[in-house]
Amino acid sequence: RRGARQARGPLTQDRIQQYRIRYILAKLTQYVEEQAWGNPAYGRIDHYIAEKVEIEHILPANPRPDVRDAFDKLQEYATHVGRLVNLTLLEKTINGSVRNGSFKDKASGYKQSSFLLTKSLVEKPQVGVNTQLNRAVAELIQFGRWNSAAIQKRQEMLAKLARKVWAMPEEEGETVR
């Protein structure tokens, strides 16, 4: 329990080594893929931590001035950028085209991602009725914009997902930051 207490606090790129952030994102992404496709090929974690996959900042780390100024809580911008909730895995080729744009600018790139956790930021894939894919993405949230309220909602969603991935009991008032 001592280790769990030490881990509390925001999960940010400043507090946690990059390879650990990548691993956490990979496990979350892998879980969704396995639930959706039921394919053992998705069991290999190296698929998600390969050199062809990058950590994408949804709220850009180096934004254009117009992107930064459009954020609803400008004074909190820097604190949100490195948080786990603001990160997602994205194929390197797609990430190169969306780099420092607004969420609206990045949406078309996210839709092209093969990772359901990333794709679902803007579009929740559906196939038929009550299919394995639909059940896998049911609790994922899509967003029309990326502001402080969206960040809070995704934080709650990722916390629920993390509890499933690591078979953790739900503790009242605890969320992934």
Residue ranges and their predicted role:
Residues 1-68, 72-80, 84, 89:
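Intrinsically disordered, low-complexity N-proximal targeting/linker segments that flank membranes
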Residues 80-83, 87-177:
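Long, cytosolic, alpha-helical-rich C-terminal regions that act as interaction/scaffolding modules
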